[in-house]
Amino acid sequence: MTVGRGSNKKTSTTTSSFGVSKRESHDASKYYDSKLYQGIPKVTDVGDPQEFPEFLRDSLVCGDSRDMSMIPPNSVQLMVTSPPYNVSKEYDEDLSLQEYLSMLKDVFTETYRVLAPGGRAVINVANVGRKPYIPLTSYINMIMLEIGFLMRGEIIWDKSASAGTSCAWGSFKSASNPCLRDVHEYILVYCKGDFKLERTKQERAEGREDTIEKQEFIDFTKSIWRFPTASAKRIGHPAPFPEELPRRCIEFHTFKGDVVLDPFMGSGSTALAAKHTGRSYIGYDISQEYVDLANQRLL
């Protein structure tokens, strides 16, 4: 009896509507050519990367980030920010929802201009209110797609370990009007033009290298992150976000020496994270008080 050997050639897989569990020899082209993906931003040529001016590296600007004309186009590798929630205090006026969203669109349009090809934009935001609930994440997603950003995904920041118990419960132990207690925020991730951030062999040889450790990289690819909030009293800002948030984004999305922008710098957490990870930073805030606070924290 002759026993023939079976073929060792692997059969490639394709993406179905429900995805697949294994990715070896995987072809997703048919899926991404489907009607589901029609009408949304696609990979496109946005020009060549430009040099970021040396005199702007590691600087904080007291000014409105709707005008970042001093920054050349295609010169910033990452934007990480948490837009202000208390708009009336930060902008000295009580903006309507539409005015607030219009302001964000102006800022993120400027962000798109200054980002390098493949550069990433990361926005930390929480939905607000209860009567009714305002889904800021949905509005921001639409704004970013209208501008032309490619969406890469979203991360749930699980804050439950540091969440307090004092809050509006609605009706307690009753179906009359129970309210959800948000113990999470969102981290929305986008990119400009292409999903890949280019790096030449010469740049790598000159020190533009990855700094993230293997286990952290594996952990950061997961869509749920867990770390505590920052103390407003300790930092001196009404809504600070912890340095851990921008640090993770910076390590995950940039190389050493890259430039990180925060158009709503606030207390300076993004600048601190950039400094501590070997990146350069540029931040904007309209409040001189917060610019001074951020500069003090950077000493």
Where are these regions (language model features)?
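Core catalytic lobe of class I
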Residues: 1-293
